Amino acid sequence: MTVTIVGSQLGDEGKGGVVDLYGDPADVVVRYQGGDNAGHTVVEDGTEYKLSLVPSGAVRGKVGVLGNGCVVNPATLFEEMDGLRDRGLDPDVRVAERAHVILPYHRVLDGIEEEVKSETDSAVGTTGRGIGPTYEDKAGRRGVRVGDLLDEDVLRERVEYVVPQKRALLEDVYGIDVEDLENPDAFDVDAVYETALEYGERLAEEDMTVDAGTFLAEKRAAGENVMLEGAQGTIIDIDHGNYPYVTSSNPTAGGAATGSGLAPTVVGQGEIVGIVKAYLTRVGRGPLPTELAGVEGQTPGYDGDAGDAEEELATYIRDEGGEYGTVTGRPRRVGWLDLPMLRHSTRVNGFTGLAVNHVDVLAGLDEVKVGDTYTLDGEVVETIPSTTEKWAECEANFETFEGWPEVDWDAVDEYEDLPANARTYLEYVSEELDTDIYAVGVGPDRDQTVVLESPYDD
C-alpha cells in the first residue's frame, strides 16, 4: 500500500518526525518534490539528524528515493550521505533519472533574482539554493536531468545550450559582469560541464540512479509498502497556495503522483495523512491572519511594536518550539492555529487522517486560541480566498480554549494521558475538519508521540 505524508500548513509542521514514526512498515520512502530548501529534523535514539534532501526514512535503514518531481543538488546529496556514513549509518538512496539537477548558475541567479524582487517589496523569501530557477528551466525545456549526467555527449550538448543563455541573462538583463562574481565558473561552459560530469560519475559508481516510476511499481508488485514524503506545505503549493508567496512545486497529495511516477489511483487508494502544527508558523512574507506580533522584514506593516503581551507570547512560542528555519536560521512568524487554512488543505489533499504536533509547546498558557473563521468584506468565510490580496484583507475570528498545564510528557503514552483541555482542543479540530486524528506529538523524539491509529492498520 501507499501512505502519503503532506504538510497541511506552510511547512515546518514536523513531517520528518511523522515519516519516522510510521516508517517501520514502510520499505521505501519517496521524496516527490522540492530540493534542499526544505529542512527536516529526525531524532533517532536521542540523536538529532538535520537533513534537507535525503529522505527521512534513510535514518532508519529504509530505501530512500528522490522522485522525478524533485530538483537535486548532487553536492548537497553527497554531503548529507557522507555525513550519515560518518555517524555510522549506511543510507540507501536512489535518484530518479528524470529529476532535474541544480547547477551552480541556478544558485547564483536565485540570489540575484530575490535581491531584485526585494527592491520592489515583492521578495518571496527563498533560501537562495537555486530551487526556483531550476524549476523554471524544467518548465522552459532547457534543464539538465539526472539521466543526462550519465551520458558525456548529451551532458555536453545540454550545458553548451543553456550556460550561454544564463550568462546573457546575468550580464544583459541584470547588468552584472560575470568576473565580478565570487564564483565566475558558475557561468563557464567547461567548468559547469566538469562539475556535472563528476556528479554523474559518483552517481554511477554508487549505482544510485533509477527510473523511479518503474522502480516503485516493481516494489509495490513485490508487496512492499511505499511511503511518499512531501516537503514544505499545502499553503505554499504553487497551484493551491497563496501565490506568489509559494514554492515552485506541488507539496500537495496530487504532486505525490506526478512527482513519483506512481498513478493517481495508486496514491488515492492509499492513506493521505495531513501534518498539523498545533499553532501556526511561517518564514517570509505573505498573509497570516492569526499572527501574533510579527517579524520585522517579513510581516507586512510590522514595525516591531505589537504590544508587550503579544510580543511576549509570540517570543515564548517561538523559543519553546524552536521556531527558526532549519536551513536559513531565520525566525519564523508565529500565530494561532488557522482553521480556514486547514479546511482548504483538507479539501485539496483529501486527508484520511491528521497528525498534530507540538501540543506540548502550548502547555502552560492560560488560554489557547484557534482562528475558526475569517471576516472578509463584512461576511464570515470558512476557507481561504483564492487570491493573496483578498486573504491579506481577512480578519480572523477566534474560539478560545482553556490552556493545559505542563506535565511529564515522557509519561504520556495514551491519548487519555493528555491533559483534558488539550484533548478538548484536539477534538474540536478533528470535528471541524471531519477528519480523525491519527497521532499527537508531545515532543521531538519518536517515542514522544501518542499514536491513536496507524495508516497501515487494516
Where are these regions (language model features)?
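Non-transmembrane, aqueous-exposed alpha-helical and coiled segments at domain scale
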Residues: 1-458
